[in-house]
Amino acid sequence: MKDVQEIPDEEHEQVLSRVAAVDVAKASGMVCTRVPHASTPGRRVSTVWQVSATTNAILALADELAECDVERVVVESTSDYWRPFFYLLEARGLSVWLVNAHQVKNVPGRPKTDKLDAVWLAKLTERGMLRPSFVPPAEIRELRDYTRLRVDLTRERSRHAQRLEKLLEDALLKLSTVATDLMGVSGRAMIEALIAGERDPRMLADLARGRLRVKHAALIEALTGRFDDHHGELARMLLDCYDALTVQIEQLTARIDTLIGQLPAAQPPAGDDSGDGDGDGGAAAAEARLLPAVERLDEIPGIGPRGAQLLIAELGLDMTQFPTAGHLVSWSRLCPRTIQSGTKSRSGQTGRGNPYLKGLLGEAAAAAAKTDTFLGARYRRLVKRRGKLKALVAVARSILVIIWHLLADPTARYHDLGPDYHTSRIDTERKTRGHVRQLQALGYDVTLTVAA
């Protein structure tokens, strides 16, 4: 007897009558339209031509596609060259999909040209065999440009601090082994004094502030070296670059705060009548529940205010793009691919995903792992049998699931389940028997009494 399983088609898998596809390059794009033949039923006609990647040429293309009543335009995501085509065609009111170039490759063994690639992309489009990539709305894209630049400048500022540390090592100064923060108040004062010409280790050690004062003897030893004039000149350049980046980061933060405040206010989910009541009282209660998304995301262990801003910039506020938390996790590449062949199934790699989002979630997972919370306990449970890296990925996935629920429901708030959630609820009898056996093995006579 055959094991027959019926697999239903996806809702979007339907033949489209009029489609267009754009194979993008740096200076131009190869456009292909597929429409029904004017006189022969069932026959389709492909038209291929090249369009310059300039604004006026793309606007003219948008008008032409609109006149042809194109139902969907698919743009291949090649580097950043897709942006002019996607933005201008979208602004014209066309239905534009951005598709992953890795998922639309032609059949191996066939000739590869831009013209054939455009035709192949159009054929996939008309048969509904493509999945659109997530492209947030314009206001979120603007916010994302600021947050990503802030991340990049913060990393570059850290590199300048590392270069300064290497410079001090070249000058035989071991300041970073005593001071945990080289760019803190004490470390900065000592470096400025070195640049100004001070070479006496005792005078430099006297510049220590706060808890670093108790390490006076260690500072004298660490500040004994050969700091020359050329070291001072290079250190001055590095500090100036560091300060300039700090100013730019502060400007970006102020702009990001403004853009976050201009985002549309969250609305309670449909069917939420918990705020109903006597007129304005119910509305006031509902407004009090709808805290800003940044504040609600900040309640998650490991996610700070800047991290919450980056999450909104990368994911947006509309979670209808991701029907379930599993869809968001899959899109973020935080779940391993399942590879099944014959009777064997194994887990593949998670994939690259969004580097800014995955980087933030990795840092948040590492920070949450050190806390006495549910997420911290989850990490400690998994690290014993899975290792550190897999445990961190699992915690990052849990954080992303929490984020989806908070963004999908503006009235939701994060509530920590506590570090003892698993130990007090899962297999309690089995754990009790195990502890009793261990005590008996040590020679104890155990009598269990239920606590009142």
Positions of predicted regions on the chain:
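A detector of single, family-specific signature residues
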Residues: 1-452
